[in-house]
Amino acid sequence: MLFKRKIYDKFLAWKEETCGKKALLVEGARRTGKSTIAEEFARNEYKSYILIDFARAPEEVRDYFRLHLNDLDTFYMLLSVQYGVQLHMRESLIIFDEVQLFPKAREAIKYLVADGRYDFMETGSLISIKENVKDIVIPSEERHIKMYPMDFEEFCWALGEEPLVRYIRDCFERKIPLERSIHEKGMLIFKQYLLAGGMPMSVVAFLEGHKDFGKADLEKRDILALYRNDIMKISARYRSKVLAIFDQIPGLLSRHEKRVVFKRIAEGSTAEQYEETF
C-alpha cells in the first residue's frame, strides 16, 4: 500500500534544482517510509533505477566500491549486470538504501556525482548515520533532507479524505468556522490519527484491519522493539543512558511541561551526565 507523502515534492525540487550536481541524503527514523518513497520516486521520475539495499547487498557489490571506483565504466557495468537494469545517461537514479551500513558507499558519492552520468539518492537511519562516519570523508556533494512519520494531512490522504483537507484549508485561509458536521468528522479522524499514529506500517494495519486500532497498536509495538534493538547496537558508552531516556518518553509526554527532567531518569542524575548521550 503506497501513500501520498509531502516529501515527494521536495524530491522533485532536488532533481530540478541540482541537475545531478548533488546527491540527496534522506535521513529519518526507522520505518518512516524512506525506502518506499525513494523507490516510488525513482519508478515515476526516471527511465530506470537501481536500489542497492546495504542491509542485503551481497559482498560482491561492496567489492565494486572497494575495487572499481577508479574505473567507473567498469563500476557501472557491474552494477547494471548485477541488478539486471539498463542505465541511461542522466535518466537513471541509483539509490543507496541503508547507506549507514556501508560508509564506503557514502564516501564514494563525491566521485560518482562528479562523474555526472546518473542521479544518486541515499537513505539512512538517524542514529547510525551519525555514528558510522569516523573513517570516511563526508562528501560535500549532498543535500540533506529529514523524513518524519505521516502528519495529519497525509493521514487524511491515506483515508481518501482529500476533500476534507481542502475544505479545512479553505476555511482556515478565509478565517471562517467549519460547518458543524464537518468539524465533528474532522475531529473524529484526528482522534483516529492520534491512536493509529503516523508510522506508515501502523496506518496500513489500521486500514487493512478495517480501522482496527488493535492491529495498529501491534505494529507500533513491533516498531518500538526494533528501536530498542537499534539502541543496543550503538556504542556501549552511551547504551544504558539512551535506553533509560527511551523508556522515559511515554512518561515525559504525559506531563504538562513535556521536557526531560534528568532526576526522573535516575536518582541524583544531572544534565551534565547526559549531555553527550543526547
Task: List the model feature ranges, each with a label.
Residues 26:
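Hydrophobic anchor at the beta1->P-loop junction of P-loop NTPases
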Residues 34:
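Conserved lysine of the Walker
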Residues 111, 128-144, 156-161:
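Short regulatory helix/loop adjacent to the ATP-binding pocket of P-loop NTPases
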